[in-house]
């Protein structure tokens, strides 16, 4: 019988898939420290019921810094001592994996079946890579491979007991010798290579070394949502992934999914663990840094005061070098300072820079012997009072030492983490960044950069000495993260719940330097949520409920709450601080024709640079009320070229003669209080013989302009009355 040639390639596959008598697989690694990388390795193996024997824990590492130089011979020495018991174990397969930068994504059976499917004739198999490390001059001596990578990598290899014993015992090795060079020289010896029956997994059918090929290796999901690594260059799906050299950040990305961590159908597989709650409330440190002009610090401090954590269990560290925030800090400390366990405060002009302050805070925290330290910047606004409690519980439950709550600028994709990092050390967008930010993928994620708010447990806090000065060419937060990456400390971002947001402060410094008395007033575009909370009247949203009827003080004169008392007070202070009130005459150079028919003592919004903000405000908050009351009239966006604050004083201009406004409709907002700030005042609508006191601070009168509502401003008899006037849609 003749066998058709095209069927021959199928025979090994059929044989391999019917193998039932697989050898035992023993997995071993060498690790002198219990690092985050080792924990990840063990967790990924455990997910597939693989037990890894860890050798060398607690032993002093003498093998050099293998990230940047040759070394690692100590691993061979430790393995050589251990391998004795497998000298004659021809029915046992030994696998070695590096400890700190490897992730498993398959069980023992799958690994062994893949080995026998592709390498059944071999006794030793090493992973392959595109670089001839550590001695490039050896490249010509390597055997040519038909397809795939041709250079040996010693981070992942497997073989039968006797061959593993022999290769580890061939030569004596010093701790500082290079382990990869050791195996390379054996592989390049053709006699030894054949004797040991060695081969390389050149197409990454089992072992994937990432360095130099990260663009080829992507994340895919099976139909059931199970994650797998896919090598697009060779159309293979490697089972064990090694982040050798500078590819560790990419391994961290893949490691967020592989090892049965995240499933596209089921979500995070390691989340939702039973939270390790304890009645014991540990002493923690709370560190706040204000090192640039940031708006709404007052609100940030209020949220800090509302944190659901006993203040007597908090060591408080505050650093503020911004003059505009000094009073905010003083007010906060006066109200809450004595409640804290202890505190250190730097508030005002200081020679201590932001970088030095952060390093000092770390040491101050350690000296207080805290269990956790939470470092936050002034632009982190937390609406979730349990943020610290949650992070502490996650740190304990998930065994993560550095974790940040995900917060971002509202309505934008800018957040406090990077999903990837470019070759120059700056931001790069990861494939999953958008999904994490939008909440389409939820969990806790190992990322290369976190900032704005970070929790350290005690162990990591001890390791962070001078981390913010690790690289002074970088910003302090980038320096800390680089220190963490270079030293194997994983940085996690948690997006399992909504914690708050980042305050936008990019252009705030410019507003401050312009000499504004209350620069937050100009923040309606950048930080609308906080602006609204501070400056919109608390009763405004009630009137926008469908069933609510807006009050009419006179026919078609609607009276409703609009601005907070604080806004009214600050607007008055801004205008008085500006001080260039018109003289009340008909001559007005601010107007196009230079003539004002009904003059007042006033300052226009465009004079103080508030025109754009006020137009947006009216379109956002006034127009919806107009559409609810004057039904059938729509004009979006609203227009106005007459927006101004009027000042009435008995000795200056106490009243205003009857007139029509040059508008489709107008609003007048009372800015101060009758009986407290002035006497008299009010508005009389002549056609209806109806008078409105207009004395509720922050309330707006809205009425038609040109035709029906002839009105006059009644005399202010004592004090000073201020109103805000806008002629809308002239």
From Swiss-Prot:
Disulfide bonds join 268-271, 554-690. Residues 664-707 are annotated as: Important for dimerization. One of its GO terms (molecular function) is procollagen glucosyltransferase activity. Its EC number is 1.14.11.4, 2.4.1.50, 2.4.1.66. Pfam families: 2OG-FeII_Oxy, GT_PLOD, OGFOD2-like. Its main location: endoplasmic reticulum. The keyword Secreted applies. Mn(2+) binds at residues 98, 101, 242. GO terms for cellular component: collagen-containing extracellular matrix; endoplasmic reticulum; endoplasmic reticulum lumen; endoplasmic reticulum membrane; extracellular space; Golgi apparatus; rough endoplasmic reticulum. Homodimer. This is Multifunctional procollagen lysine hydroxylase and glycosyltransferase. It comes from Caenorhabditis elegans.
């Amino acid at each position: 019988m003749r066998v058709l040639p095209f069927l021959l390639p199928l025979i090994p596959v059929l044989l391999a898939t019917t193998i039932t008598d697989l050898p035992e697989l023993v997995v071993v690694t060498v690790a002198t420290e219990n690092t985050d990388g080792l924990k990840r390795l063990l967790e990924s193996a455990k997910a597939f019921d693989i037990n890894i024997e860890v050798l060398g824990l607690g032993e002093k590492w003498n093998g050099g810094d293998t990230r940047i130089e040759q070394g690692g011979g100590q691993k061979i020495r430790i393995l050589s001592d251990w391998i004795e018991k497998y000298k004659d174990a021809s029915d046992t397969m030994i696998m070695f994996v590096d400890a700190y930068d490897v992730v498993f994504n398959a069980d023992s059976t799958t690994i062994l079946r893949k080995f026998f499917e592709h390498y059944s004739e071999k006794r030793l198999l090493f992973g392959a890579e595109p670089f001839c490390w550590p001695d490039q001059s050896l490249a010509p001596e390597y055997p040519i491979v038909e397809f795939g990578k041709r250079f040996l990598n010693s981070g992942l290899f497997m073989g039968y007991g006797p061959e593993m014993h022999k290769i580890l015992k061939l030569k004596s090795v010093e701790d500082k010798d290079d382990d990869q060079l050791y195996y390379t020289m054996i592989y390049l010896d053709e006699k030894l290579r054949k004797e040991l029956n060695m081969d390389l997994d050149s197409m990454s059918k089992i072992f994937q070394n990432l360095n130099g090929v990260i663009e080829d290796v992507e994340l895919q999901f099976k139909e059931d949502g199970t994650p797998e690594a896919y090598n697009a260059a060779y159309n293979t799906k490697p089972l064990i992934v090694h982040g050798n050299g500078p590819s560790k950040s990419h391994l961290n990305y893949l490691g967020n999914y592989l090892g049965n961590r995240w499933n596209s159908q089921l979500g995070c597989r390691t989340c939702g663990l039973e939270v390790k709650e304890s009645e014991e409330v540990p002493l923690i440190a709370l560190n706040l840094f204000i090192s640039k002009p940031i708006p709404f610090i007052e609100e940030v401090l209020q949220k800090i005061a509302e944190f659901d954590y006993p203040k007597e269990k908090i060591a408080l560290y505050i650093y503020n070098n911004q003059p505009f925030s000094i009073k905010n800090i003083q007010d906060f400390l006066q109200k809450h300072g004595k409640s804290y366990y202890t505190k250190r405060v730097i508030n005002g002009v200081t020679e201590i820079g932001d970088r030095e302050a952060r390093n000092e805070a770390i040491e101050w925290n350690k000296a207080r012997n805290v269990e956790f330290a939470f470092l936050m910047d002034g632009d982190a606004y937390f609406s979730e009072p349990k943020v610290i409690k949650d992070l502490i519980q996650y740190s304990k439950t998930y065994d993560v030492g550095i974790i940040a709550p995900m917060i971002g600028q509202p309505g934008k994709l800018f957040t406090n983490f990077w999903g990837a990092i470019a070759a120059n050390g700056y931001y790069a967008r990861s494939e999953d960044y958008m999904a994490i930010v939008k909440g389409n993928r939820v969990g806790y994620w190992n990322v290369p950069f976190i900032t704005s708010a970070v929790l350290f447990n005690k162990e990591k806090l001890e390791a962070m000495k001078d981390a913010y000065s690790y690289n002074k060419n970088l910003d302090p937060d980038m320096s800390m993260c680089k220190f963490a990456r270079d030293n194997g400390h994983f940085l996690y971002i948690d997006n399992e719940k909504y914690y708050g947001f980042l305050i936008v402060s990019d252009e705030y410094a410019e507003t401050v330097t312009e000499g504004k008395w209350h620069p937050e007033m100009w923040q309606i575009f950048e930080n609308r949520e906080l602006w609204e909370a501070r400056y919109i009247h608390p009763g405004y949203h009630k009137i926008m409920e469908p069933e609510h009827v807006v009050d009419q003080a006179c026919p078609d004169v609607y009276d409703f709450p609009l601005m907070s008392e604080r806004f009214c007070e600050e607007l008055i202070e801004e205008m008085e601080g500006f001080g260039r009130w018109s003289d009340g005459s008909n001559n007005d150079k601010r107007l196009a024709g230079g003539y004002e028919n009904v003059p007042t003592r006033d300052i226009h919004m465009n004079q103080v640079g508030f025109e754009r903000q006020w137009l947006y405000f009216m379109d956002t908050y006034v127009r919806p009320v107009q559409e609810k009351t004057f039904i059938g009239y729509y004009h979006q966006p609203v227009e106005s070229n007459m927006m101004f604050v009027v000042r009435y004083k008995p000795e200056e201009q106490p009243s205003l003669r009857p007139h029509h406004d040059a508008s489709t409709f107008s609003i007048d907002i009372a800015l101060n209080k009758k009986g407290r700030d002035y006497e008299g005042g009010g508005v009389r609508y002549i056609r209806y013989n109806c008078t409105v006191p207009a004395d509720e601070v922050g309330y707006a009168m809205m009425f038609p302009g040109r035709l029906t509502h002839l009105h006059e401003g009644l005399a202010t008899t004592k004090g000073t009355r201020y109103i805000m006037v806008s002629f809308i849609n002239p």
